[in-house]
Amino acid sequence: MKDTE
């Protein structure tokens, strides 16, 4: 999962 998109 990424912290930001």
Curated annotation (Swiss-Prot):
Under acid-stress, this protein is expressed at a higher level in wild-type B.cereus than in the acid-sensitive mutant strain NB1. This is 88 kDa protein.
